[in-house]
């Protein structure tokens, strides 16, 4: 059996095989392993709920898991305290140890699932973004997927503990923020407010979410984005930029200072292999890879 995809959080891991089988291990206090119990496992165990299904993608948050199966069905399991597994408003629950279908995507084809902290997101083939879970910047929680109403055609999404970053046509936009100001501050402007609207009836005006453009990259085209718990990384065609919390050295700047706007990271011989680089973030670290 060949494992094609893994998704790791601090205390639990998931593995998806080439045959669409899902295996999980680690902490299961909130049912985030989807095994129907709350027992933790120190070896991978198959999630039997999906035994007759084909799992295509997985995403792990702090205490919850999302799974996309063939047929464009999205499942959530684990902690539901902030709505991160898409539980119905009429059926509040603190956790769920068996996968449940998340409603609210209509006939959209889902091509990407994302999770971090208590946040969840799904990207459609048309570049539309749905978000749910803990509200950003003090907004109320979303207990069901909410469509981000925007003219942007989003191609990449990454989530932090308190912020989200999206990439559209080489430009970066931010949702939310936190005390270290991941990609915000005086260098962020919002010439167009891209609002989110609920995918199920909702009348609360205060629930409007907005994307803000990150405009401090001197016109450079961004090709990849990544987010850790409280920091972010942007890979342009010529440079790597990091910003946010720096207490563990995760910004790669030779210090542990926090940064409120993107800083260029010095990578030796950058220009000789810039087109083959990839960038990824863990909770408190950043990795730059070079492909063959």
Describe these PLM feature segments.
Residues 1-2, 23, 27-42, 75-96, ...:
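Short glycine/serine- and acidic-residue-enriched loop/turn motifs that recur at repeat junctions
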Residues 6, 48-50, 102-105, 146-150, ...:
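Surface loop/turn motifs at the tips and blade-to-blade linkers of beta-strand repeat domains
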């Amino acid at each position: 059996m060949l494992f094609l995809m893994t998704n790791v959080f601090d205390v639990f891991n998931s593995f998806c095989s080439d045959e669409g089988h899902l295996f999980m291990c680690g902490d299961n206090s909130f049912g985030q392993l989807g095994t129907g119990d709350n027992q933790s496992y120190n070896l991978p165990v198959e999630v039997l709920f999906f035994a007759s299904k084909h799992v295509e993608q997985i995403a792990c948050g702090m205490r919850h898991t999302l799974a996309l199966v063939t047929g464009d069905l999205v499942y959530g399991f684990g902690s539901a305290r902030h709505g991160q597994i898409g539980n119905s408003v009429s059926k509040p629950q603190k956790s769920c140890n068996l996968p449940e279908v998340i409603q609210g995507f209509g006939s959209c084809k889902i091509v990407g699932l994302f999770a971090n902290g208590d946040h969840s997101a799904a990207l459609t083939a048309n570049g539309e973004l749905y978000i749910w879970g803990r509200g950003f910047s003090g907004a109320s929680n979303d207990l069901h997927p909410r469509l981000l109403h925007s003219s942007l055609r989003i191609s990449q999404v990454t989530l932090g503990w308190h912020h989200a970053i999206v990439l559209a046509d080489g430009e970066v936009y931010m949702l939310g923020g936190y005390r270290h100001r991941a990609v915000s501050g005086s260098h962020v402007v919002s010439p167009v407010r891209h609002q989110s609207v609920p995918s199920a009836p909702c009348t609360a005006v205060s629930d409007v979410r907005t994307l803000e453009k990150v405009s401090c990259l001197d016109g450079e085209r961004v090709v990849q984005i990544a987010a850790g718990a409280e920091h972010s990384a942007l890979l342009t065609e010529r440079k790597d930029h990091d910003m946010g919390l720096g207490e563990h050295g995760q910004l790669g700047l030779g210090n542990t200072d926090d940064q409120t706007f993107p800083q260029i990271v010095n990578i030796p011989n950058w220009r000789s292999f810039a087109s083959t680089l990839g960038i990824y973030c863990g909770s408190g670290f950043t990795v730059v890879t070079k492909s063959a």
